[in-house]
Amino acid sequence: MFMGSIVALITPMDLKGTVDRISLKKLVDHHVVSGTSAIVSVGTTGEMSGLTHEEHVDVVMRTLEFSDGRLPVIAGTGANSTAEAVALTNKFNDSDIAACLSVTPYYNRPNQEGLFQHFKAISESTDLPQILYNVPIRTGCDMLPITVSRLAKIKNIVGIKEATGNLNRVNQLKQLVHEDFILLSGDDLSALDFMKLGGVGVISVTANIAAKEMAELCKLANENDFSTAQHINQRLMPVHQALFIDSNPIPVKWACKELGLISHYVLRLPMTVLSEVHRDVLKQALIDSGLFYNQSNYK
């Protein structure tokens, strides 16, 4: 279930800045038919920090409703307060959510023991599978492999989204965790190399606009056909890079609108829209990758 191309889904909004449920359903349907393995709802790319708690829960539950059992839905439930993360996680205890994705606490920068106790407390509050999420560039703290190995011994902590982009981490984690512990990349640029070293998939920003391509890339990688997967990856490389020309999800939401996947290009402050210069760069990347001329994928 937790392998292959897992999309870090954007949260579409209408011109009033409220969640656009029509576009959200369209996105879910698109991923169902495109080979995406699962959906992460309201993670970093889904603007978790820009939604109220009520909206956060509603978007996850709407995504689950629109999926209707066709794709597993993983709920983003991280917070920098342990009590808040526990409360948010427990909102989904009686739902059909497949798992929770829980980011390391941001801003307060806990030490390694604090990280261990944080995730231990969350896992003890629920029976839902927990996927750890390490993204130091966003949070200001780095969960080290030795801490992950301690957490991997907890029954319902089943894997990690490792988004440092440091491929040495894969080798370190492989040596320290049990063989069933799921290793997912959180960095599209290095995802294929991550999978070559033992990862089983990626929680992908690129999959928002290249769902079929990312699904095929991951399928080939999991079949050890890295040569063919590399051809796809090379074609997508301009997009992997351009989607981070500004803070995520500013570029990817613009690309989704350009490709007709959503109705409006709207973000919430403090996120602002992509500059004209960066739009030109991203548009060229879409053209170079062939995505701009293959819009039949997005009907």
Swiss-Prot record:
GO terms for biological process: diaminopimelate biosynthetic process; lysine biosynthetic process via diaminopimelate. Keywords: Amino-acid biosynthesis, Cytoplasm, Diaminopimelate biosynthesis, Lyase, Lysine biosynthesis, Schiff base. The record marks T44, Y107 as: Part of a proton relay during catalysis. InterPro entries: Aldolase_TIM (IPR013785), DapA (IPR005263), DapA-like (IPR002220), Schiff_base-form_aldolases_AS (IPR020625). One of its GO terms (cellular component) is cytosol. The keyword Amino-acid biosynthesis applies. GO terms for molecular function: 4-hydroxy-tetrahydrodipicolinate synthase activity. Pyruvate binds at T45, I203. Coiled coil: none annotated. The keyword Cytoplasm applies. Its main location: cytoplasm. Pfam families: DHDPS (PF00701). The active site is at Y133, K161. It comes from the Bacteria. It is found in: Cytoplasm. Pathway: Amino-acid biosynthesis; L-lysine biosynthesis via DAP pathway; (S)-tetrahydrodipicolinate from L-aspartate: step 3/4. Its EC number is 4.3.3.7. It catalyses: L-aspartate 4-semialdehyde + pyruvate = (2S,4S)-4-hydroxy-2,3,4,5-tetrahydrodipicolinate + H2O + H(+). Catalyzes the condensation of (S)-aspartate-beta-semialdehyde [(S)-ASA] and pyruvate to 4-hydroxy-tetrahydrodipicolinate (HTPA). Homotetramer; dimer of dimers. HAMAP family: DapA (MF_00418). Belongs to the DapA family. This is 4-hydroxy-tetrahydrodipicolinate synthase.
